[in-house]
Regions:
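Alpha-helix capping/helix-boundary segments
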Residues: 8, 24, 60, 85, ...
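Active-site neighborhoods of divalent-metal-dependent phosphate/nucleic-acid chemistry enzymes
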Residues: 52-99
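Short, hinge-like loop/turn segments at secondary-structure boundaries
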Residues: 35-39, 71-72, 114-116
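Short secondary-structure boundary/capping segments
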Residues: 9-12, 45, 68, 88, ...
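Short acidic-hydrophobic, aromatic-tinged amphipathic segments that line or gate anion-handling sites
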Residues: 54-55, 113-115
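Short, well-structured N-terminal submotif of metal-dependent ribonuclease cores
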Residues: 1-24, 30-46, 51
């Protein structure tokens, strides 16, 4: 699984079943920095120490191109970072766990699990 968004770590599967995309890690860091609270950064560091962070590779770029072109052709775009996250997960055959399942479900061939 690739994790996106805030979750209770204790409720998630332990590694190696769960991992975080480097794209998600970047989004989480942006949120932690904007929060301007040391506790946010410390919590994020713990999360990133617990779960493996998966590198975004050139292999993922082809899948991204396929996803973006398909979504645009169907007139069902999703956010640009969500497209990258979807490409990363689909290239690995992974499941995206997200609070934004509705948007990710627009991506053909992507496994999505709603996180509440």
């Amino acid at each position: 699984m690739i994790l996106r968004g805030r979750t209770a770590v204790a409720e998630l599967p332990a590694p190696p079943e769960a991992a975080i995309s480097a794209i998600v890690a970047a989004e989480l860091w942006a949120g932690a920095v904007k929060a301007k609270r040391a506790s946010e950064a410390a919590a994020l560091e713990q999360l990133l120490d617990f779960f493996p962070v998966l590198d975004f590779t050139v292999n993922v770029t082809r899948v991204y191109g396929e996803i973006r072109a398909d979504l645009e052709q169907r007139g069902q775009p999703i956010g640009p970072l969500d497209q990258l996250i979807a490409a990363h997960a689909r290239s690995l055959g992974a499941t995206v766990v997200t609070v934004n399942a509705r948007e990710f479900k627009r991506v053909k061939g992507l496994k999505v699990q709603a996180w509440k």
